[in-house]
Amino acid sequence: MVVIEIGEQAHRLRDITSAMSHPRVLWYHLILPTYGFWLPNDPRGSWSTFVGSWELCKFGRATRTSEKRSLAHEAHDRELRLAAKRALKYPPVRFDELQRQAIADGFATAVEEGGYVVHACCVGHDYAHLVVARHERTIERIASHLKSKATMSLTRQQMHPLRDFTTRDGTIPTPWSAGIWSVFIDDRDHLNSAIRYVERHPAKEGLAPQRWTFVSSA
């Protein structure tokens, strides 16, 4: 049988197929890094596609290695890493308090539009954490929707961190990294741990507790 995918039906078919390929996934711990937060060619690494410990997410996305231990604290050429950051086209993005509120406003819009269920959310200096229930859409599409509405909110409120780099045609570079991290959650204990982690995370960033209207209890 040949299936021809057209427009939104194509997205829907791919999303349903993706969900079926991970039948045990009930929730996701989604991490959205900002532009410049981490470089994919960082000389450090770890043992899997996702950083095994959430605490190590702050050290960035890992490159694959055969090591059975974390290499996040391994000695590496710090100057090389900093030079790579300096070579970025735009300055690394860090959100201030007003920008974090604008981002949350955008997230709220996406949650309402998509009918997503979010159990926890932290908007930090250079990334956002969310615990999201499984949905007919893929986590990649949900992430794209969240980032899009957050960016629109920043732009509308004239708080876009890269507005000084607006092009002649009015385009502003995205404040988000192209990639995301998503940790699959398939049991209630893991869910509760993820929620606690995200709820406590603002304090680790030196931020006040965050309470968002689009977050619902699990």
What are these regions (language model features)?
Residues 1-218:
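Short catalytic/metal-binding and nucleic-acid-binding patches
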